[in-house]
Amino acid sequence: LVETKDFNIGSEGDIFLVDNAKLSGSNRLGNSFNIKANKINQIDNKLPIISGDKITGDINISSKIHIQIKAKIAEINTKSNVLKLFGGFQIINEKYKLIGKEIFFDFKKNTITSDQPLTFLFSKGEIQGGKLQIINSENKENDLLFLINDGVKIKYLL
């Protein structure tokens, strides 16, 4: 779903540009997102990939897990259900903050991955690493399982 007050379609009907857009979506697994973008348009004048800049929004990974996102640029592939945040991003939760260059939300597989360096900040310290995979934990009380590797550095306050 896209909401906007300013929608421009090319003369051939094959391109579009939306200013001050709100995008939202959900799937059968309970994932949902609400994103605000300064501008959105399709990539290479083809759907299903939509690009946006100056992104802010909320993502519900499950009924218990809610995060806020900020990014310079986002791409949403509506066919594969993948959201890519890049050009600098922040993911914020009441327990942690994740900062990096690029990250992928795969709503079909219910995973979050990054192959770029990132910093994971929490109340007692920080973890820096080169790769990240976040998956839903089998133990529902633990929320998410963070797998960080490739040059991990940990700072922890006792």
Locate predicted features.
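Mature-chain termini and adjacent capping regions
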Residues: 1-158
